[in-house]
């Protein structure tokens, strides 16, 4: 297993392009997560792709031959498909929407609500979805119980500029164009497609894996169903990694995956909690990464400090 210093990790993170800020993105943790992956494998499958931070990081290092991106949130997949396959189209259409806010009567905030209304009325183009994501608070996608995008705009900024977007998506396209499939299916359908030689990376939405509805998505994910799907991967000999629960200070959030799955749990240092800093406490957030059987055996022995809990800084 390759290891990196904290300074190297920061440098790697800065050099990996991203499309737009996205709450829950594993971009900052990608260098740590990739340390537990094989140097080469056939296909990377992301059933909960979001903005595909792990796929982008893996493709930059040319570790996989093919990539499969899936997310139940179809408009997000529309962004990824255009960014990778037709970046010229995405940049041109996004530029139109983004520049319109600068001259819109009533200002950029009013413009945001106009685009949001159009999106909810059916114009779920990649450019509209990307603009809403770039402008909304914390880059946090939120839907109502009826599937309406209901996040508010961040009034302090205009969102990712077309120039910055172009620089990043052309890089991303150069890594992934012609090597990637896109879908918006139930994650279990995607897992059925995995074969030995593939690596599945799963980052289920928040604690939607804990029987609760996650309002980034149109449906929640049942814990027992998820555990059953993971067990099925085990029985088929598929390599996989899961970003799942974690802790901040003394507080643990999320439910541990069952021990009978035979997974190794690693705690990755995600840095100081911004919320705790605001409250005058300096508490470190750790995010859990679960490794399947063969990935555990590939890990360098010096890193096997504990079977269930291991801090990686």
Residue ranges, per PLM feature:
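Short, solvent-exposed loop/turn segments at secondary-structure junctions
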Residues: 51-54, 73-75, 135-138, 187-190, ...
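Short His-Asn-centered micro-motif
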Residues: 47-48, 70, 183-185, 202-204, ...
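Long, positively charged, glycine-interspersed low-complexity recognition regions
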Residues: 220-313
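Short, surface-exposed loop/helix-turn segments at secondary-structure junctions
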Residues: 213-221
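SAM-dependent nucleic-acid methyltransferase catalytic core
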Residues: 2-32, 87-201, 205-213
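A short acidic (Asp/Glu
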Residues: 56-58, 79-81, 193-194, 210-214, ...
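SAM cofactor-binding core of SAM-dependent methyltransferases
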Residues: 35, 40-117
């Amino acid at each position: 297993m390759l290891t990196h210093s904290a300074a190297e990790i920061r440098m790697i993170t800065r050099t990996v392009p991203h499309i737009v800020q996205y709450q829950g993105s594993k971009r900052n943790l990608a260098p740590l997560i990739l340390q537990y992956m094989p140097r080469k494998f056939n296909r990377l499958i992301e059933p909960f792709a979001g903005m595909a931070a792990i796929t982008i990081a893996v493709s930059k290092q040319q570790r996989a031959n093919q990539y499969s991106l899936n997310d139940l949130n179809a408009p997000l997949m529309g962004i990824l498909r255009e960014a990778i396959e037709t970046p010229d189209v995405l940049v041109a259409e996004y530029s139109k929407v983004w520049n319109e806010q600068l001259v819109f009567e009533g200002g950029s905030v009013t413009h945001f609500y106009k685009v949001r209304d159009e999106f909810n009325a059916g114009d779920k183009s990649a450019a509209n979805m990307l603009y809403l994501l770039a402008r909304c608070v914390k880059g946090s996608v939120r839907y109502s119980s009826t599937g309406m995008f209901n996040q508010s705009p961040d009034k302090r900024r205009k969102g990712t500029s077309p120039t910055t977007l172009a620089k990043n998506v052309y890089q991303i396209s150069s890594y992934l164009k012609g090597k990637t499939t896109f879908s918006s299916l139930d994650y279990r359908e995607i897992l059925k497609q995995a074969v030995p030689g593939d690596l599945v990376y799963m980052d289920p939405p928040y604690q939607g894996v804990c029987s609760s509805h996650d309002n980034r998505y149109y449906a929640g994910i049942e814990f027992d169903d998820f555990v059953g799907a993971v067990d099925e991967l085990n029985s088929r000999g598929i390599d996989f990694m899961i970003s799942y629960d974690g802790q901040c200070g003394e507080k643990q959030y999320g439910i541990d995956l069952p021990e009978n799955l035979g997974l190794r749990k690693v705690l990755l240092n995600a840095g100081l909690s911004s919320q705790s800093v605001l409250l005058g406490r300096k508490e470190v957030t750790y995010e859990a990464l679960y490794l399947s059987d063969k990935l555990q055996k590939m890990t360098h022995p010096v890193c096997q400090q504990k079977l269930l809990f291991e801090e990686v800084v």
